[in-house]
């Protein structure tokens, strides 16, 4: 299923960058400098402020539409982050890992087994505009670097054409106003 929605790039602007991080469950006793609270169901859980991963470690994504109309995505990480994810999920089973996207909690997963493939999933809660930003910032899973660069060049051409069209429309409005 393909949904045609104008991207920010097609509207004449480069999309802003998303900030995505995953945070491991901590303890309230760690203190407010080290953890932050999040309500989960009828409980309040605490998560470490220090993230497990960083944006620059994501190498690709594969997104999907969820039943609630938001998006989910699988994020693939570089080797260094994949090793860290494997170690953390091995030693922290029976804890939660929360995804924070642009300053808001999006989804949380329960760690029931080690993650050995360097991939973390957000099952729901990503907005369409955020998916567009990710698509602009990184390759889709299975897409070569060359294919990704060509896709971005297409976005740039659309952006420049939209800017030119907007400028021409403004010039026409100014011309009519002055006559």
Describe the function of each predicted region.
Residues 1-4:
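Bacterial N-terminal signal peptides
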């Amino acid at each position: 299923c393909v949904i045609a929605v104008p991207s920010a790039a097609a509207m004449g602007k480069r999309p802003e960058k998303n900030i995505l991080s995953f945070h491991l469950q901590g303890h309230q006793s760690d203190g407010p400098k080290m953890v932050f609270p999040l309500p989960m169901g009828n409980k309040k859980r605490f998560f470490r402020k220090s993230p497990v991963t960083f944006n620059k470690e994501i190498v690709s994504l594969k997104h999907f539409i969820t039943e609630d109309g938001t998006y989910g995505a699988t994020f693939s990480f570089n080797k260094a982050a994949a090793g860290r994810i494997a170690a953390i999920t091995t030693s922290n089973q029976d804890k939660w890992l929360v995804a924070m996207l642009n300053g808001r909690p999006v989804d949380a997963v329960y760690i029931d087994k080690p993650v050995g493939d360097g991939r973390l999933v957000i099952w729901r809660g990503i907005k369409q505009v955020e998916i567009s930003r990710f698509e602009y910032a990184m390759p889709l899973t299975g897409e070569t670097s060359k294919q990704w660069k060509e896709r971005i060049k297409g976005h740039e051409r659309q952006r420049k054409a939209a800017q030119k069209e907007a400028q021409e429309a403004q010039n026409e409005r100014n011309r009519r106003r002055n006559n």
